[in-house]
Amino acid sequence: MRAVFGCAIAVVGIAGSVVAGPADIHLVAAKQSYGFAVASVLPTRGQVVGVAHPVVVTFSAPITNPANRHAAERAVEVKSTPAMTGKFEWLDNDVVQWVPDRFWPAHSTVELSVGSLSSDFKTGPAVVGVASISQHTFTVSIDGVEEGPPPPLPAPHHRVHFGEDGVMPASMGRPEYPTPVGSYTVLSKERSVIMDSSSVGIPVDDPDGYRLSVDYAVRITSRGLYVHSAPWALPALGLENVSHGCISLSREDAEWYYNAVDIGDPVIVQE
C-alpha cells in the first residue's frame, strides 16, 4: 500500500453537511409574521458546539428575490456576551447561515431568534487545530493551552516533535494534491468512512487511486477534506507531505483529536 492515500468521498453540498441532524421541534413552524416559513435552525436548542459554528437557517421554500433575502436576514437575531458581529452567506436558495467575525466565547450560551421563534445553544471549549504544511505538524490548543494525547509507554523519543505540547506529526497533501490553505470549520465526525478516489476524478484502478476504510475522520469541507488516521503514512508523519490533500495523523493522535473536537470547532491550514 503506497503512502499517498488521500481523502475524498462522494461530493455533497455544504448545506447538507452543515444542516444535517435532527430538526429542532421548537423551531419548526408554519408561516411566521415576517413572511417566511422556517424548517429548521442550527445549532439546535441546547446543543453544545464548537466556537466557530455558524447559525444556519433552513426555510421551507426557496427565497431568491434580493429584497426578500434581506428581509429574511433581518429576521435573524443573535445575542451573545460579548456581542458579536458577523455576515450572512446563502448556501442555497432556501438556506442561509450567519457566520461570526470571530470565534464565539468558549463555555458560553448564545441566544438566537428568527422572527417569533427563539432558541439557544452552548459552546464548548475552544478546540483550535492548526496545520502547518511546511512544518508537517498539526497543533491543537484547548482554551488557549496547547494539548495533545499523552505519549504511549515506553515514550517514543524518536518521534518527530516529541515533547512539544500539542504538536502532532502530520502529513498534508503532496505537490500534485496540495492541501488548500485557509480557515475551516468541523462539519462532521465519522468513526469510520470509506474514501474513494473516483469521487475526485481519480479511477480506483489508477496508480494514484484508492478505496479504503479510514478511522477517526473529522470532515472540514463538503468535498471531502478530513483530519484522519493514516497508519500507512507513519514513516512520513512530521517529515513530508504524501496525502491527496487530507491532514494525516497517527491512529493515536487522530483518535484523541476526534474525541476532543466538537462540530463547529475551527481548523486553520497555513503554509
Swiss-Prot record:
It holds the Pfam family YkuD. CDD domains: YkuD_like (cd16913). GO terms for molecular function: acyltransferase activity; peptidoglycan L,D-transpeptidase activity. Residues 127-270 form the L,D-TPase catalytic domain. Is irreversibly inactivated by the beta-lactam carbapenems via the formation of a covalent adduct resulting from acylation of the catalytic Cys. Imipenem is the most efficient drug for in vitro LdtMt3/Rv1433 inactivation. This is Probable L,D-transpeptidase 3. PANTHER family: L,D-TRANSPEPTIDASE (PTHR30582), L,D-TRANSPEPTIDASE YCIB-RELATED (PTHR30582:SF2). The active site is at residues 228, 246. One of its GO terms (biological process) is regulation of cell shape. The lineage of its organism: Bacteria, Bacillati, Actinomycetota, Actinomycetes, Mycobacteriales.
